[in-house]
């Protein structure tokens, strides 16, 4: 049974909002159907009642199997596979932005109805499978007293954590199960208001840069443009000095980042704006161009002006880059990572995408992990369901967040409703050559192993100690999200 709100006026408003027509156009892929925008007092809002998995399990394709490798976590968000195969899990809930309008008061309880009731962990948990049999015997707290940790990356012997207010680091030795002290702050991150609090992160494999996604402070500038300073952007950060610069802008909420193997291209998944109807605007996957502008707040899906933004900026709209691949409207995509050959030929060339699921559609979407195939280095064709079964007509059993590919042949999925980490593997291993250089500059998840990784030069900090922003490499290198 769907969660009911007992306040009669609220219930009436929600019912009226849900009465509009909601045909589901195919607003996914490289050329989505956008349709006309719709305006109303409230969006359609349906959240299925959270329920225990019980004997149920997520559904995966034939030839694959799924298991729960960690349970009883405290809101797991993103994961990082370390060079020795250990997994770090970032646990936490952030953000406490004030509600601006009556609609925010209405939507708040409905959003909350589809989330876990446990207290935020504000910690990192380490998982270990000592004998490689797929059972993670060790589940222990690696570090606590963090502030809504989300993005994770590793460069050489340091683990980087993107809290909601700062980028911090821990020294690390292979096999270590607990941090040896409090983290060192690399740089503060924008945190005032924190309407979108998550700070996604990935590392270049040569260890020179971290990329951090910083979401907007509103849906569509309700707090004014001053509140959007250093928001809806991706920062490029020097991990040695903390110096940073804006790498790309106009991305409303970049919730996960990854680097494409081979090309070194930075990719992001982005949550788009609300309140233009159930079928606008699609969340998206895109290659991130240095200096690129992706539309927010002035336009969506390239150069389609948002009618609510006044005054408009025609030059900004004209410069907006059309994203590479639409993921559907309101899917709340929160995870992305490139696959590897060990995941099997059908799922070896492309990205896995974690969809947390909608709250503002009468016909729910998302609540699954999909695979987006690539051809010649670009997204191609329709998305393929890879992990489903997180909800049915009556109940929600889980909500996927981060997805991380273990290069040995496994997909790690964080479920922040059931507080479980799922692991999906082929039932029979695929015979593929192992990549050389495992355990190089960055670990898989928020910054992945690359055989060409190079240790950051000791001279980098001195060369940039004059306060200048770090110079961008011609082509950022690395893998993972």
Regions found by a protein language model. Name each.
Residues 433-481:
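Compositionally biased, proline/threonine/alanine/serine-rich low-complexity intrinsically disordered stretches
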């Amino acid at each position: 049974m769907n969660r009911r709100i007992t306040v009669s006026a609220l219930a009436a408003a929600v019912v009226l909002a849900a009465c509009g027509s909601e045909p589901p156009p195919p607003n996914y892929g490289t050329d989505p159907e956008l349709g006309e925008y719709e305006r109303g007092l409230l969006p359609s809002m349906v959240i299925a009642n959270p329920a225990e998995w019980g004997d149920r399990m997520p559904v995966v394709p034939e030839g694959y199997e799924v298991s729960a490798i960690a349970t009883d976590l405290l809101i797991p968000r993103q994961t990082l596979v370390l060079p020795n195969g250990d997994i770090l899990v970032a646990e936490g809930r952030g953000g406490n932005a004030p509600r601006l309008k009556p609609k925010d008061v209405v939507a708040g309880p409905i959003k909350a109805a589809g989330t876990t009731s446990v207290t935020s962990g504000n910690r990192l948990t380490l998982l270990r499978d000592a004998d490689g049999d797929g059972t993670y015997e060790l589940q222990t707290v690696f570090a606590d007293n963090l502030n809504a940790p989300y993005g994770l990356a590793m460069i050489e012997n340091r683990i980087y954590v993107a809290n909601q207010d700062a980028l911090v680091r821990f020294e690390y030795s292979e096999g270590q199960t607990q941090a040896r002290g409090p983290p060192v702050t690399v740089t503060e991150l924008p945190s005032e208001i924190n309407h979108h609090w998550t700070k996604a992160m990935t590392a270049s494999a040569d260890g020179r840069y971290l990329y951090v996604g910083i979401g907007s402070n509103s849906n569509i500038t309700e707090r004014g443009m001053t509140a959007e300073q250093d928001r809806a952007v991706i920062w490029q950060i020097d991990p040695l000095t903390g110096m940073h610069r804006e790498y790309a802008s106009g991305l409303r909420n970049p919730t996960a980042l990854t680097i494409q193997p081979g090309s070194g291209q930075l990719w992001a998944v982005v949550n788009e704006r609300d309140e233009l109807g159930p079928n606008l605007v699609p969340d998206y996957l895109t290659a991130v161009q240095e200096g690129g502008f992706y539309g927010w707040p002035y336009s969506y899906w390239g150069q389609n002006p948002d009618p609510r933004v006044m005054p408009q900026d025609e030059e900004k709209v004209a410069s907006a880059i059309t994203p590479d691949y639409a993921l559907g409207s309101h899917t709340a995509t929160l995870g992305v990572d490139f696959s590897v050959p060990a995941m099997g030929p059908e799922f070896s060339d492309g990205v896995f995408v974690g969809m947390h699921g909608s709250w503002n559609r009468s016909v729910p979407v998302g609540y699954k992990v999909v695979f987006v195939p690539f051809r010649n280095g670009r997204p191609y064709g329709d998305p393929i369901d890879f992990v489903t079964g997180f909800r049915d007509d009556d109940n929600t059993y889980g909500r996927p967040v981060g997805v991380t590919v273990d290069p040995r042949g496994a997909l790690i999925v964080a479920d922040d409703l059931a507080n479980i980490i799922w692991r999906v593997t082929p039932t029979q291993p695929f015979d593929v050559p192992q990549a050389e250089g495992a355990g190089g500059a960055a670990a898989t998840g928020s910054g992945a192993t690359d055989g060409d990784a190079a240790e950051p030069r000791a001279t980098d900090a001195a060369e940039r100690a004059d306060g200048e922003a770090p110079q961008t490499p011609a082509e950022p290198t690395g893998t993972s999200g």
